[in-house]
Amino acid sequence: MAIANKNIIFVAGLGGIGFDTSREIVKSGPKNLVILDRIENPAAIAELKALNPKVTVTFYPYDVTVPVAETTKLLKTIFDKLKTVDLLINGAGILDDYQIERTIAVNFTGTVNTTTAIMSFWDKRKGGPGGVIANICSVTGFNAIYQVPVYSASKAAALSFTNSLAKLAPITGVTAYSINPGITKTTLVHKFNSWLDVEPRVAELLLEHPTQTSLECAQNFVKAIEANQNGAIWKLDLGTLEAIEWTKHWDSHI
C-alpha cells in the first residue's frame, strides 16, 4: 500500500513509537492522518502539520476502553467527513503489570473493540469497501517476558486476534497484519512494574541488552505498511524488519 493520498486512522499515534511513526507516515504524504488518542497534545499535532503542510492532520480524543457503540459513533463522524478510510492502526498499549484489568482492557479488548466498530463501515457483507488493519502487538506475543506475564499475555492475545482477522479477509474484505516491536527505547520501558513485584529491576535489566530507537522502529513500520501483506507477522527488532513464520501445532480443520 502506497501511503500517498491515503486516509489513515492511527489509534495512539502520539505515543513513543506511535509519534515517530506518525512523523514517518506524514513524510510519505497521506491525504489525511486522523489521530485518536487519550490525551491531546497540540504541540505534537502542530509539529506533524508543519512537517508536511499538504497532509491534513486531525485529532479526536479517544479512550480504547469505551464501549463499542461509543467507538462506532466516533468512527461515523470520521467516515462522514472523509468518506473513505484506507488503513486503521491500533496502537494503544500500556506496560504495568500492577494494573491487570486495565492492561487487558487497553492492550487486547481495546484492539478488538476498535476493530469490531470499524467493521460496520468496512465489512463487504454490509456493502463496505474493505480496508486494512495494522495492529501493534509485541515480540512478547512470541515469547513472554515472564516477569510481566499479564502484559505478555495481552499481546499474545492481540497477535492471535490479528492472525484470525487475516484468515477472515475473504469473508469480510478486511485484511490485517501485526507489528511486533522488540525492546524499543521509549518512556514505556524506562520504568514499569512487574507482576507481584517478582522482579523490581525488570526495566533496568531489559535495557542492559541491545535495543532499538523508536525512529528505527517507525521507519520499519512504514515499510511494513507499504508491503501491505495480509497475515504478515512482522518482527521489528534491533532496527530490522522481518516477516516471521508462525509454527502450527494444531488445526481446527474448518
Swiss-Prot record:
The name this protein carries in UniProt is: Alcohol dehydrogenase 1
The EC number on file is: 1.1.1.1
Give the Gene Ontology MF terms in alphabetical order. alcohol dehydrogenase (NAD+) activity
Quaternary structure (record):
Homodimer.
Keyword terms: NAD, Oxidoreductase
Q: Which PROSITE patterns match?
A: ADH_SHORT
What CDD domains does the record tag this protein with?
ADH_SDR_c_like (cd05323)
Q: Which residues form the active site?
A: Y151
